[in-house]
A protein has these predicted regions:
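Junction motif at the cytosolic side of a transmembrane helix
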Residues: 11, 262-283
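Aromatic- and glycine-rich beta-strand/loop motifs that create alpha-glucan
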Residues: 1-25
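Secretory targeting signals
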Residues: 22-106, 130-200, 206-207, 211-215, ...
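Short hydrophobic, aromatic-rich alpha-helical segments embedded in or entering the lipid bilayer
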Residues: 224-248
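Transmembrane helix boundary and interhelical loop/hinge segments in multi-pass membrane proteins
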Residues: 103-122, 126, 134
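Short loop-to-helix capping motifs
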Residues: 15-16, 124-125, 197-199
Length: 283
């Protein structure tokens, strides 16, 4: 198992798309931070208050809009902090979009090659290969979060007159839970990619997850559940993408428990489904 994990990590760090996506992500963060800095200078106090209330959920119900929506939760009169922009990009799934693209490319890179056929014939249990990919994606998730934090910190120092990081304890709590949620999202994407064995369809479905397209389907399920006389139940609250959006900067115990439970449940189920399909498939 350790050899398979080392092999997958070696393959991941040899993948050119890993570094290309990181570079594009860095450029995107620098560009969007520069735009945010310019826009904040033009907003009135009323507009800043409205944006703050919207970003912190004070002006909306428990729903998620279609598409990407990055809003900075900075209080009127305060300087935009690293935590504010980190939160805005995470909540809007800006970071998740880059991560799922890599997850699809990495998960399907060797599915049709002679390499995977050769390796699968040598191991006792093919499911170990899926687990090894999962470990590699966890390492990728942690590294991407660290890189994102570093680039966002540099961007804030470059584009804002005053540098403010934000409350460190709250940041670590939020970032830690979001790391696990994003890892769960990548495991879901990996499962989709390996089961379907089609880059185009897998990429489309993964992007749809980040664009909240499935909200329409979740609303349909909510209506069916409501007709069964089950009140105040929302499917979105028990999905990975829903928890990525709903998690607030001031993480409560309920938010943390729900997010952790959903993440762990999806990771276990998706790896089991993916490994079972991969084990039985004729490669």
């Amino acid at each position: 198992m350790l050899n398979m994990i080392r092999m997958e990590l070696y393959r991941m760090f040899k993948t050119k798309s890993l570094y290309v996506i990181w570079l594009v992500l860095a450029a995107g963060i620098l560009f969007t931070t520069g735009l945010s800095a310019d826009e904040m200078k033009t907003y009135t106090m009323e507009e800043k208050q409205e944006m703050y209330e919207y970003a912190t959920g004070q002006q909306k119900s428990d729903t998620v809009n279609l598409g990407m929506d990055v809003t900075v939760p900075t209080k009127p009169g305060d300087t935009v902090s690293v935590f504010d922009l980190f939160y805005g990009n995470i909540k809007g799934k800006f970071l998740a979009l880059f991560m799922v693209i890599f997850a699809v490319l990495y998960s399907t890179a060797d599915m049709t090659s002679g390499f995977i056929k050769n390796i699968a014939g040598q191991v006792r249990d093919r499911r170990g290969l899926v687990f090894a990919k999962g470990v590699s994606l966890f390492v990728y998730t942690v590294l991407t979060m660290l890189i994102f934090t570093g680039i966002q910190t540099v961007s804030n120092a470059l584009f804002f007159d005053e540098f403010v990081f934000g409350p460190v304890k709250e940041f670590l709590q939020y970032a830690g839970i979001q790391t696990l949620l994003h890892f769960a999202l990548l495991i879901i994407v990996m499962c989709i990619a390996i089961v379907l064995r089609n880059n185009v369809i897998s990429m489309m479905l993964s992007v749809c997850l980040c664009m909240n397209v499935l909200v329409i389907f979740y609303s349909f399920l909510d209506n069916l559940i409501a007709k069964a006389h089950i009140k105040n139940f929302h499917v979105l609250e028990y999905t990975v993408t829903g928890n990525i959006s709903f998690l607030e900067t001031n993480v409560t115990a309920k938010m943390a428990v729900t997010a952790l439970a959903v993440s762990i449940a999806f990771v276990i189920v998706m790896i089991e489904v993916c490994s079972t399909v991969f084990k039985k498939r004729d490669i």
